[in-house]
Amino acid sequence: MELHSLKAAEGSRKVRNRVGRGTSSGNGKTSGRGQKGQKSRSGGGVRPGFEGGQTELFRRMPKRGFLNVNRKEYAIVNLETLNRLEDGATVSAETLVAAKIIKDVKSGVKVLANGELTAKKLTVKVAKVSAAAKAAIEAAGGSVEEA
């Protein structure tokens, strides 16, 4: 066996079908598009959701809700994630980004009570803290300051 004699396994590679290259190819002339009509033309076809003139499903459904352009989106940090920090550390948006716990501060940081906080005296200075998270941090001997 030599490098120049290597071949792909039979049936592992399929030859690309080139359309419009003569009638004997099986896909010449109309290139597999059939005869006349919208779908045979270049750029032909209907837009997504079009149902032949019948009112489309998405138009039959009622509108719901709205998107508040002034919404505040917080970077979420759970108690179990705070266990990565050393004892006595100050938890702020800057320290969390530096520790690569969060990527982006967004409108601020919110601490939630998912998971357990092992006994650590943390000083938490963030935008928002849930009531359960605040209780857990203070029970572990830490302090919470909401900015």
Swiss-Prot record:
Residues 23-35, 42-52 have a biased composition (Gly residues). Residues 1-57 are annotated as: Disordered. One of its GO terms (molecular function) is structural constituent of ribosome. GO terms for cellular component: cytosolic large ribosomal subunit. Keywords: Ribonucleoprotein, Ribosomal protein, RNA-binding, rRNA-binding. GO terms for biological process: translation. It comes from the Bacteria. It holds the Pfam family Ribosomal_L27A. Gene3D superfamilies: 3.100.10.10. Part of the 50S ribosomal subunit. Binds to the 23S rRNA. This is Large ribosomal subunit protein uL15. It comes from Lactococcus lactis subsp. lactis (strain IL1403) (Streptococcus lactis).
